Amino acid sequence: MPSGFQQIGSEDGEPPRQRVTGTLVLAVFSAVLGSLQFGYNIGVINAPQKVIEQSYNETWLGRQGPEGPGSIPPGTLTTLWALSVAIFSVGGMISSFLIGIISQWLGRKRAMLFNNALAVLGGTLMGLAKAAASYEMLILGRFFIGAYSGLTSGLVPMYVGEIAPTHLRGALGTLNQLAIVTGILIAQVLGLESMLGTATLWPLLLGITVLPALLQMVLLPLCPESPRYLYIIRNLEGPARKSLKRLTGWADVSEVLAELKEEKRKLERERPLSLLQLLGSHTHRQPLVIAIVLQLSQQLSGINAVFYYSTSIFESAGVEKPAYATIGAGVVNTVFTLVSVFLVERAGRRTLHLLGLAGMCGCAILMTVALLLLERVPAMSYVSIVAIFGFVAFFEIGPGPIPWFIVAELFSQGPRPAAMAVAGFSNWTCNFIIGMGFQYVADAMGPYVFLLFAVLLLGFFIFTFLKVPETRGRTFDQISAVFHRTPSLLEQEVKPSTELEYLGPDEHD
């Protein structure tokens, strides 16, 4: 266990770091169960594509009757399948607009709890679609599970970011992405023909997404609400004190409350902002642009094109068993996300994001070369595997985990919910565009499709290098000061601390 996970005693009057308590572990685990579902439903639609399309055709024939014109037209089937993939993102786009409203109205924990109703509804519709001979039910189920995931994509990083100690905020924030990629990997494994990816069992493959929802409904009531939300937003000192005691394991949290009172006093001049107020705010324009571009760098990097269509990409690259190669990419995905958990508090957010973008750009160029030379050099199929594995690995070093939690770091308590909504909508809009349009772009551009992503990745690298600040080890107030141009705060020595502990000046300064 890294040393950062241990409680560090006070030295020279410096407040101790918050140790990792059982309550903190339970709260983070319960929250990221939502991210696990998010990832599962990204990956689950890929492997069983052919058997689901066959089911669509059977439904079509059943509705036409024996005197009908025959099998479903290829163009109609392509459209139905693209809609089945992309409607997930439509649900996410719509629900992401509600992140700020719901998180302020219900609170972070209760919002995640009630969100599970969408997961249960979506999973039930998808699981019963074959029995009901209705591809509309499957598409509608994908919409509801997408709406669930859209809320999850904002609520989970917000909750984890607000309960996490500053010195672990990056590592715990990265667990959100680790849960997503673990969900993708589980979906890829269960989607094999030897598992649930068969003509008979694919409804079960899609329907079991209700299981983590039910588990989260059991665990979340045992977890504390965000003390920042309770005290700063709801002005509930008693419940906030109780929540702090459970999260920190400290009997005396008076200094923590003093810090929250000071932050609340400052934020009284910065009321919670609506979406329109945030978009019109000159003060928050720069961090908002950064938040949006970081979300674009995640989605327009091409990673979802790889996951949505990985099997067909490996087939076109000449790989004999593309489903297993896809699972290999999922394993790489998970391993390198785990690596980023340990790197993010050492190397920093900005450095890892730059490294990831540069590596992905190189792998995209390598993938283009491999696809161009495949017919003349059969060994290029192996190069394509290396390129995709490298592409996935570099994604999980930076562009995968960083954008999700850095948005919560760039904004103070007042504008944070609205900022999460804007960033989430940007992410889901790009997700939809890739899911709906990649196949058409790939057909038009052929082997050069990944060159397009390489150009975009280069642009995102330049933007990150020029505009994105480092947030590692800084409190929310210190990060906010970057955009308010307060040099005195920027020049402060970054000391180990937690967002839920005393932030006052060091006695020796």
From Swiss-Prot:
Domain remark from Swiss-Prot or TrEMBL: The dileucine internalization motif is critical for intracellular sequestration.
Name of the protein this chain belongs to: Solute carrier family 2, facilitated glucose transporter member 4
Residues carrying Phosphoserine: S10, S274, S488
Organismal lineage: Eukaryota, Metazoa, Chordata, Craniata, Vertebrata
SUPFAM superfamilies with a match to the protein in the record: MFS general substrate transporter
Similarity comment text for this entry: Belongs to the major facilitator superfamily. Sugar transporter (TC 2.A.1.1) family. Glucose transporter subfamily.
Top-level division of the source organism's lineage: Eukaryota
Protein modification: Sumoylated. Palmitoylated. Palmitoylation by ZDHHC7 controls the insulin-dependent translocation of GLUT4 to the plasma membrane.
Residue intervals annotated with topology Extracellular: 46-81, 133-142, 193-200, 309-323, 375-384, 439-445
Metal-binding among keywords: no
InterPro entries per the UniProt record, alphabetical: Glc_transpt_4, GLUT, MFS_dom, MFS_sugar_transport-like, MFS_trans_sf, Sugar/inositol_transpt, Sugar_transporter_CS
GO molecular function term, any single one: D-glucose transmembrane transporter activity
Membrane topology annotation: Multi-pass membrane protein
Chain's role: Insulin-regulated facilitative glucose transporter, which plays a key role in removal of glucose from circulation. Response to insulin is regulated by its intracellular localization: in the absence of insulin, it is efficiently retained intracellularly within storage compartments in muscle and fat cells. Upon insulin stimulation, translocates from these compartments to the cell surface where it transports glucose from the extracellular milieu into the cell.
Binding site for D-glucose: Q177, Q298, Q299, N304, N333, E396, W404
Phosphothreonine sites (modified residues): T486
Organism, as annotated: Bos taurus
